[in-house]
Every structure is written in C-alpha cells, then in structure tokens.
C-alpha cells in the first residue's frame, strides 16, 4: 500500500515515476489474493520512462543507474568517484541500457560520465557558474525526491534502492523507489522524526550545503503543503 500510494503521488509531481497497479492473482485457477504489480525502472517501447536509445556510432548514451546492495552482475556493475573517494560502500549498477549495448567502452564511458558529475558536485566551486551542479542535475527532480522521501521518513532513500537517470542530451534526474520501510514501517523506531536524514547521503550531502537548493526546497515544500501534501488531500 505504501508503494502504491507514493508512486502514484510521485507520478503527479515528477517527470517519471514507476507505474503501479493493484491486481488479483489466480494461479492454476486458485485465487492467491491481492498483489501490487509494479513497473521496473527501465526505458523501453512499453515503458513510461523514455530515454534516447544508444547508437552504434558513439559510445555516449542515455543511462539509468541504481545505487543499492550488490547485484552480483559484473557486466552491469561500475565504480564511480563516490565509491573510491568517499567510501560509499553500496554498489552502482547500470539498469539502462541493457547488456546488448553494454560494450566495455560504453560501460567505461558511463562510469566516467557519472564520476565527472560527482567530482563537480564535491568541488569547491560546485555552486558557482559555469561549474554549478544545476548545470548537470535537474533542480525540480532532486528537490521533489528529497521532499517525498523525508516526508515519508523513507530512510533507505539516497543509499539503497536509489535510482538516477539521464538522457544523453539532458540532466540527471531522480526516480523514487521502494517505500516498504517508509511511513513508520522502518526496521527500528525513528527516535527523532523531526530531523532530516537524506542530507547525510552521498549526493545530497553537498546539495544540502547550497543555500539556493535549500531555498528552492523550502519554496517547493510550502507549495506542496497547499496541495498534494496537505493534511486534507
């Protein structure tokens, strides 16, 4: 129910959120109960996420990445700046494009491209034109992701079950995923729910130091509290 609710709400706010439906399941004619069917995060003909397809003429490509516990898939796994410089212990996997397009050269390009973004985010001039983080990352997407996950106390966000994607000609955007532990369903009690958590996680650690990002998030939160996140909604 948490995933169903928040995926649908995110779909009204963000450029992309996974499609989700309740469905009744029958197996060999025997009723199994009510389940939640969820779209996996990927780009394809029948997917809601539409990224520019790879081209055989260049190794540059659109891509989607997942930060999570290790998948064990050596073909999809990459090492980025945050892992070897910031001691980020989670694994980064490529979820798009598929293995058909993942040549060693293209995989290396994706790893380098995302590492360049992380390096710029952790540089001393990360909030100064022309090197500012917002030149590479979509402000609205990163603020909405922060607000939705903090609002629901979804403490997996930003270090587990975390997805980020980028069209080859676009900016980085976040995608919500996995609210199983949200809304007071965490594995241990939340002692101080009035405190923020996402600000300590890898990319948001630096974003939270930027006054412009904080002000944009405050403005966005106030707007959402008048609508989709209001007490009456």
Walk through the language-model features, giving the residues of each.
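Phosphate/dinucleotide-binding and metal-coordinating scaffold of catalytic cores
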Residues: 1-233
């Amino acid at each position: 129910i948490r995933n169903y609710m928040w995926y649908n709400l995110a779909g009204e706010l963000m450029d992309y959120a996974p499609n989700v439906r309740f469905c009744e399941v029958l197996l060999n004619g025997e009723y199994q109960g009510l389940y939640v069917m969820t779209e996996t995060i990927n780009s394809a003909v029948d997917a809601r996420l539409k990224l520019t397809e790879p081209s055989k003429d260049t190794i540059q490509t659109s891509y989607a990445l997942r930060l999570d516990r290790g998948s064990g898939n050596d073909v999809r796994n990459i090492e980025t700046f945050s892992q070897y410089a910031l001691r980020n212990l989670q694994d980064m996997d490529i979820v798009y494009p598929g293995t058909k397009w993942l040549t060693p050269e293209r995989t290396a390009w994706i790893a380098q491209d995302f590492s360049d973004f992380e390096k710029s985010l952790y540089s001393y001039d990360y909030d100064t034109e022309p090197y500012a983080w917002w030149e590479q990352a979509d402000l609205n997407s990163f603020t909405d992701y922060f607000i939705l996950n903090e609002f629901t106390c979804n403490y997996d966000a930003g270090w587990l079950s975390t997805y980020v994607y980028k069209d080859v000609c676009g900016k980085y955007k976040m995608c919500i995923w996995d609210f199983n532990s949200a809304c007071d369903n965490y594995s241990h009690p939340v002692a101080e729910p009035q405190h923020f958590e996402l600000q300590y996680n890898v990319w948001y650690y630096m974003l939270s130091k930027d006054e412009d990002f904080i002000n944009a998030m405050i403005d966005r939160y106030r707007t959402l509290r008048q609508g989709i996140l209001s007490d009456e909604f």
